[in-house]
């Protein structure tokens, strides 16, 4: 009897199972990378909005009062909130700036800073 050349069905199925396992791992890795990039992008733009609001306070520290508003950046609307914080002495004024992606949502970034009184 002549021997036939080629792969058996079992060999093909084993190879396919190995390939499928590897492909699933690659897909999960790429998906996680995309999620991380989106998260870092959101944090970066929120930090830029915080920087803008902190600069406004630094330019005019006498007008430090609780307020909130919105700002356009990177084609999105960011909602910020400025909150004065009491300090132990009168040498410094403290304030928090929080930025969220939706009004009333949990802030993406919150930063505390100080200005001279």
Curated annotation (Swiss-Prot):
PROSITE patterns: PROKAR_NTER_METHYL (PS00409). The modification N-methylphenylalanine is found at residue 7. NCBIfam families: gspI (TIGR01707), IV_pilin_GFxxxE (TIGR02532). Component of the type II secretion system required for the energy-dependent secretion of extracellular factors such as proteases and toxins from the periplasm. Part of the pseudopilus tip complex that is critical for the recognition and binding of secretion substrates. Pfam families: N_methyl (PF07963), T2SSI (PF02501). Cleaved by prepilin peptidase. Methylated by prepilin peptidase at the amino group of the N-terminal phenylalanine once the leader sequence is cleaved by prepilin peptidase. One of its GO terms (biological process) is protein secretion by the type II secretion system. One of its GO terms (cellular component) is plasma membrane. It is a single-pass membrane protein. The keyword Transmembrane helix applies. This is Type II secretion system protein I. The chain crosses the membrane at residues 7-27. InterPro entries: N_methyl_site, Pilin-like, T2SS_GspI_C, T2SS_protein-GspI. Type II secretion is composed of four main components: the outer membrane complex, the inner membrane complex, the cytoplasmic secretion ATPase and the periplasm-spanning pseudopilus. Interacts with core component EpsG. Belongs to the GSP I family. Residues 1-6 form a propeptide. The lineage of its organism: Bacteria, Pseudomonadati, Pseudomonadota, Gammaproteobacteria, Vibrionales. Keywords: Cell inner membrane, Cell membrane, Membrane, Methylation, Protein transport, Transmembrane, Transmembrane helix, Transport. Gene3D superfamilies: GSPII I/J protein-like. It is found in: Cell inner membrane.
């Amino acid at each position: 009897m002549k021997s036939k050349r080629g792969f058996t069905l079992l060999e093909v199925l084993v190879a396919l199972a190995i390939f499928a396992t590897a492909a699933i791992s690659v897909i999960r890795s790429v998906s996680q990378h995309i999620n991380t990039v989106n998260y870092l992008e959101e944090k970066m733009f929120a930090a830029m909005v915080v920087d803008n609001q902190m600069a406004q306070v630094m330019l005019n520290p006498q007008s430090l009062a609780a307020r909130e508003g919105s700002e356009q950046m990177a084609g999105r609307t960011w909602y910020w909130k400025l909150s004065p914080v009491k300090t132990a002495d009168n040498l410094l004024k403290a304030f928090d700036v929080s930025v969220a992606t939706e009004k009333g949502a949990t802030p993406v970034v919150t930063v505390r800073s100080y200005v001279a009184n």
